[in-house]
């Protein structure tokens, strides 16, 4: 594997992972809210 490729790919992977983590966390929060409302 080329070092330049790693240098280019790592920040992209980090950004994608961070975005996915935030989206997942928000989705879990929404699901919990929906469940609370459904139980009411």
From Swiss-Prot:
Bilayer topology annotation: Single-pass membrane protein
Compartment(s): Cellular thylakoid membrane
UniProt KW keywords: Membrane, Photosynthesis, Photosystem II, Thylakoid, Transmembrane, Transmembrane helix
GO molecular function, one term: manganese ion binding
Major subcellular location class: membrane
Pfam family name, one: PsbY
A GO biological process held by the record: photosynthesis
This protein's GO CC annotations: photosystem II; plasma membrane-derived thylakoid membrane
Transmembrane segments annotated in the record for this chain: 5-23
Purpose of the protein: Loosely associated component of the core of photosystem II (PSII), it is not always seen in crystals. PSII is a light-driven water plastoquinone oxidoreductase, using light energy to abstract electrons from H(2)O, generating a proton gradient subsequently used for ATP formation.
Family classification: Belongs to the PsbY family.
NCBIfam families: PRK13240.1 (NF009711)
Quaternary structure annotation from Swiss-Prot or TrEMBL: PSII is composed of 1 copy each of membrane proteins PsbA, PsbB, PsbC, PsbD, PsbE, PsbF, PsbH, PsbI, PsbJ, PsbK, PsbL, PsbM, PsbT, PsbX, PsbY, PsbZ, Psb30/Ycf12, peripheral proteins PsbO, CyanoQ (PsbQ), PsbU, PsbV and a large number of cofactors. It forms dimeric complexes.
Name of this protein: Photosystem II reaction center protein Y
């Amino acid at each position: 594997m080329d070092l330049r490729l790693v240098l280019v790919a790592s920040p992209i992977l980090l950004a994608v992972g961070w975005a996915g983590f935030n989206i997942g966390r928000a989705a879990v929060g929404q699901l919990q809210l929906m469940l609370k409302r459904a139980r009411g």
